[in-house]
UniProtKB/Swiss-Prot annotation:
<dbReference type="InterPro" id="IPR036136">
    <property type="entry name" value="Nit/Sulf_reduc_fer-like_dom_sf"/>
</dbReference>
<dbReference type="GO" id="GO:0000103">
    <property type="term" value="P:sulfate assimilation"/>
</dbReference>
<keyword id="KW-0479">Metal-binding</keyword>
<dbReference type="Pfam" id="PF03460">
    <property type="entry name" value="NIR_SIR_ferr"/>
</dbReference>
<dbReference type="InterPro" id="IPR045854">
    <property type="entry name" value="NO2/SO3_Rdtase_4Fe4S_sf"/>
</dbReference>
<protein>
    <recommendedName>
        <fullName>Sulfite reductase [NADPH] hemoprotein beta-component</fullName>
        <ecNumber>1.8.1.2</ecNumber>
    </recommendedName>
</protein>
<feature type="binding site">
    <location>
        <position position="479"/>
    </location>
    <ligand>
        <name>[4Fe-4S] cluster</name>
    </ligand>
</feature>
<keyword id="KW-0028">Amino-acid biosynthesis</keyword>
<keyword id="KW-0004">4Fe-4S</keyword>
<keyword id="KW-0349">Heme</keyword>
<dbReference type="GO" id="GO:0046872">
    <property type="term" value="F:metal ion binding"/>
</dbReference>
<dbReference type="GO" id="GO:0004783">
    <property type="term" value="F:sulfite reductase (NADPH) activity"/>
</dbReference>
<comment type="similarity">
    <text>Belongs to the nitrite and sulfite reductase 4Fe-4S domain family.</text>
</comment>
<feature type="binding site">
    <location>
        <position position="440"/>
    </location>
    <ligand>
        <name>[4Fe-4S] cluster</name>
    </ligand>
</feature>
<dbReference type="Pfam" id="PF01077">
    <property type="entry name" value="NIR_SIR"/>
</dbReference>
<dbReference type="GO" id="GO:0019344">
    <property type="term" value="P:cysteine biosynthetic process"/>
</dbReference>
<keyword id="KW-0408">Iron</keyword>
Amino acid sequence: MSEKHPGPLVVEGKLTDAERMKLESNYLRGTIAEDLNDGLTGGFKGDNFLLIRFHGMYQQDDRDIRAERAEQKLEPRHAMLLRCRLPGGVITTKQWQAIDKFAGENTIYGSIRLTNRQTFQFHGILKKNVKPVHQMLHSVGLDALATANDMNRNVLCTSNPYESQLHAEAYEWAKKISEHLLPRTRAYAEIWLDQEKVATTDEEPILGQTYLPRKFKTTVVIPPQNDIDLHANDMNFVAIAENGKLVGFNLLVGGGLSIEHGNKKTYARTASEFGYLPLEHTLAVAEAVVTTQRDWGNRTDRKNAKTKYTLERVGVETFKAEVERRAGIKFEPIRPYEFTGRGDRIGWVKGIDDNWHLTLFIENGRILDYPGRPLKTGLLEIAKIHKGDFRITANQNLIIAGVPESEKAKIEKIAKESGLMNAVTPQRENSMACVSFPTCPLAMAEAERFLPSFIDNIDNLMAKHGVSDEHIVMRVTGCPNGCGRAMLAEVGLVGKAPGRYNLHLGGNRIGTRIPRMYKENITEPEILASLDELIGRWAKEREVGEGFGDFTVRAGIIRPVLDPARDLWD
């Protein structure tokens, strides 16, 4: 990354209204408790609409019926999305049975949605069920604290089912980092769990009274897998192992994918390497990165508030030196590491502990009973007999982890009968979409509902050109906020308007290069026509082992993005 002339450490100016809201919220309480009892509306009013995000919820409505309800002079059908805090995606079978029951009985859509933040979401929770969902989660040792808004969100960890010891150590650090960076306010416990108000003053020693300037995302990564897409995240701890044992981390800071259509001051950015640290400094360094961003992040413009913009404004070296000062350490030089892929290994994998792990492909992460494919019931039946745990992956799939040889056949039988092990193409396995319509208020174009038939068409093109055994990392996101991580794909579609997308090309398979816009505001037939030609060229002209994204760059079809803060929009 090139360095800008360092700008001011703190941006002066009028603070955004979100900063006022946080300051006046009494450490995230607002009037949420009173609002819960207001039966006149299905939603939350005023500041509470945004404050509930700190408690892991977003207020949404069903956009498929919004116009119809407006004609009937009815308010939108408000319902909440709830996102669980689940560091590293590990969930017990007892917890799974509880969330299965809640989804079936107390949500509009009846589904469990696995997300690429390695957790699950409920969609369609009516206001009367909001408090019960938090209490249900608490009863099985879960919560939804800090999974949205201006905090450190769910901490991701590579779902490595093979190196069980290394995964266990990395997962423990993901949990420790998550716990260390949680808010200290008692608001969550008071409002949702009916815990008594204590006559002490709340303090937030790490996050501060107005929390972070913007969302903040953290990962723990075990090379050579980049399944968690580290370059989409603010703070990344890359595991360095010696003889299969974790000894420390390389730290990379300042990744992020969200942009705004037409706003050239916004850009996706890959994370910058800061250096290596031994394990004992992990929490101090995590805290130092977060507090530096807390103090230096831009609170006058939320579109310029993420860590990636702070790094570009003050300079990577300045930010790094401040982290060293606050943590009381000096980073060592980056230790060697490399990535070879980021997809999940679907099917059975035997771990070095001799247990088996079954990775199930779940298209779009949507767990529901479909005609002839009762995925939700199948997973519930497995949860009832499985002695190990489940692991949600950052590719929206599910691992049945720690299966002894003696239980393999029984679990495989249920999985096959439920459609959980249906054969799919390599292309489908390596494609992903965010939720988008009908529930996401920011959606500009379809994503989850568009992807299955779109991949049917891509599969046909792959077959036509004789590359059906290959794959292209392909992602669809319904708007430029980028939850579908299209801005790290080889082929990324970013929603622009209903039925229209910007087509980005030139990312790579391992997720270390941002793709550039190739065509703007085009329809599915136009996208397929472009890809038909390009996949045909790739099939004929590629070098041995050359991925589609690397080919588009080498062949001069698209210029690579080398320094996105300066050349993404060129």
